[in-house]
């Protein structure tokens, strides 16, 4: 059974779906399944030239926007690369980016297409100051959801809250399947350790949407209250200089370590005590599940998929976004009470192990894929056609 996992970012990109898919591929490795990964190399720019036409809206209405123009050129480039590189048939294509799914439907019109929408690109741009709320760019990006609904055989997303977000932009929201990302519990796992001073950590791209400015302000309050801690910020991005300057201004720079980009955060994560990320928006928040599998106590904001992962006071703590006082109060609780911190981490690990392990997600995906693959339409795998009837 030939499956194509179609990504936008290369698989080596850290975080979210890009870090999940290579491990997903390992779990599908058998005589029954053959999975290929595909993405657009960063070097491919301005190669595609053909027109772009959508069925449910006219993108040219928004064509004066440079951001929209960039999206359309990316579509052209991805289509050009797909037509150049993909020659064999597939039994099913699973796309993980809106533009990718639309390209795959155009290039492979008769192949079943499953589309997962992992995040709201329009709100990321709004929160990061790239576009205005209510802008033509936001309207263009939200129009893509109905186009995806029209072109996909199954539309999926990663949290119930994000499905609710999609309601105004699609015709049949009740048909959207919710399946969280899965995480390799052999890669993200606890390591016994003892820290004399509580170790806080965040892992994210350094952009305004992640709320790290609020975290630094909360840490300044903790310091004023006399609490010792070390804050580890793993990641890089356009806000790094501003965040380092803010840390100096608040007097917490000496208590904060900016690591920059790291390819394998799981090598650091198990040795810390508390994971905190005060995001202003998250469709799911994959890094919370990863931290939970490493037995860290979770502190997050009551937004999007974070509040589906964390039950406040049970397996973590939730605070409102943009509230450094309540964030400091929550951190104070887990810093002051190691037993409470341990209990939150334990229940968080149990939930992540049960609901977000990659084994669970693989089983759900296999059931979903098989719905679209009648036996008489399965393309034989090389050298194993006679073994197709085997059950894993």
Where are the language model's segments positioned?
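N-terminal strand-loop element at the rim of the active site
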Residues: 6-14, 20-72
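Short His-centered aromatic/hydrophobic patch
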Residues: 95-100, 117-118
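Membrane-proximal helix-turn-helix segments that form the acceptor-binding/catalytic region
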Residues: 135-155
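Aromatic "clamp/platform" in nucleotide-sugar-dependent glycosyltransferases that forms part
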Residues: 261, 280
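Short hydrophobic beta-strand element within catalytic cores of glycosyltransferases
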Residues: 297-300, 310
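Conserved acidic donor-binding segment of nucleotide-sugar-dependent glycosyltransferases
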Residues: 312-313, 317-324, 333-338
